[in-house]
Amino acid sequence: MFYKIAQKVMFQMDPERAHHLAIGSLKMTANSPLTCLYGQTITPAPVSVMGLTFPNPVGLAAGMDKDGESIDAFHAMGFGHVEVGTVTPRPQPGNDLPRLFRLKPAKGIINRMGFNNKGVDNLVKNLIAKKTDIMVGVNIGKNKDTPVEQGKDDYLICMDKVYLHAAYIAVNISSPNTPGLRSLQYGDLLDELLSAIKTKQLELAEKHKKYVPIALKIAPDLTIEEIENIAQALIKNKFDGAIATNTTLTRDGVSGLANANESGGLSGKPLTELSTKVIKQLAICLKGQIPIIGVGGINSAEDALAKFDAGATMVQIYSGFIYQGPKLIKEIVNAYRLK
C-alpha cells in the first residue's frame, strides 16, 4: 500500500528527480524503524552461483543504486543481492538532461544516463559503511573520455579498488549510452579485455587470498554468431558468470508512444522476450560451463520463471521493480521455491 502511494506521487515528477528522491529517502530511512514502510521478510531460497551462495535468486540490477548509497534499504526489502554501479574510475556527470523517460503504457523506461556516478573511491566508502551483510556485486565501466582502445585500463583500476569490497564484479561493456563501449563486445577488443581482466583477477586473488568472481554483462542486440563468439571468449578466459541482458536500442512494442523516439536504451516489459531469447541462446553456447544471471523485462513471477527456464540460474530486476514495487521480489522468490 505504501509503495502504491509513493509511486503515485513520484510518477507525477520528472523521472530523474523521482529517482534521486527515492534513493535519498531510502538512504535516510535505512536501519531505522521507518524500514517497516517497505521492508519485508522473505523465506530463504538459497542458490549457488559463481561459487557464492545467495539467500534467494532475486537481485537488484545495476543502475538503480549507482553509488551504493541505499544498499541496506534494499536489503530490508528482501533482495538476495544488490548490484551497484555502473561505477567509473573518475566521477562524471553523464549525458545532458533530460535523459530518463517513462513509457508507462508499455511499462518501459528509456535511459541515456551515460554512467553518471561519483567515482569508484566514493563507492568504496559507501561499501565499507554499509551495515548489513547483503551480497553486493559491483558493476564497473570506463569513463566517457577514455578512448575505447585504452578502456581496459579503466576496468583494471576499478577492479583493483573494489576487489576487497565486492561479492562479485560485473564488467559492463554493453551500455548503449557510452560512445564506442559496445565495440568491446567483438573480436580482438573483447578477447584482449577479458584476458587482461582475468589476469588482474588472479593477481588480486593471490595478493588478497580471496577469489572474487567476475561476470560479463552483455547487450540484447546481438546476432546468434555474436553470442557464440562471446560465449567462446568467456569460456576461453575462464570467466565466472554472464549477465544477460542490458537495455536494447530496438523499439519493438513501443512505437507511437510518447517518448518512444528518445535515444537511449529501452528496458522494462518491451525487453522481456528479446532478453529471454538471448539468455536461451547464450545458455546453449555456454553448455552449462558458466552460469547466467538473467535480467531484462521481468515484470512478474512468470517473466522470471521464463528466464530460469531459458537457462538463467539467478535473476535481477530494475524497471519491473519500479512499476511493481518490493512485492515483486517476494512473488518471484515464492514462485522459484515452488518451481
Curated annotation (Swiss-Prot):
Protein name in UniProt: Dihydroorotate dehydrogenase (quinone)
Enzyme class: oxidoreductase
Cellular component GO terms held in the UniProt record: cytoplasm; plasma membrane
Gene Ontology MF terms in the entry: dihydroorotate dehydrogenase (quinone) activity
InterPro entries (UniProt xref): Aldolase_TIM, DHO_dehydrogenase, Dihydroorotate_DH_1_2, Dihydroorotate_DH_2, Dihydroorotate_DH_cat, Dihydroorotate_DH_CS
Catalytic site positions: 175
Residues at which FMN binds: 62-66, 86, 139, 172, 217, 245, 268, 297, 318-319
Family: Belongs to the dihydroorotate dehydrogenase family. Type 2 subfamily.
Gene name per UniProt: pyrD
Role this protein plays: Catalyzes the conversion of dihydroorotate to orotate with quinone as electron acceptor.
Compartments it resides in: Cell membrane
UniProt remark on cofactor binding: Binds 1 FMN per subunit.
Keywords, ordered alphabetically: Cell membrane, Flavoprotein, FMN, Membrane, Oxidoreductase, Pyrimidine biosynthesis
Cofactor(s) listed: FMN
GO BP of this protein: 'de novo' pyrimidine nucleobase biosynthetic process; 'de novo' UMP biosynthetic process
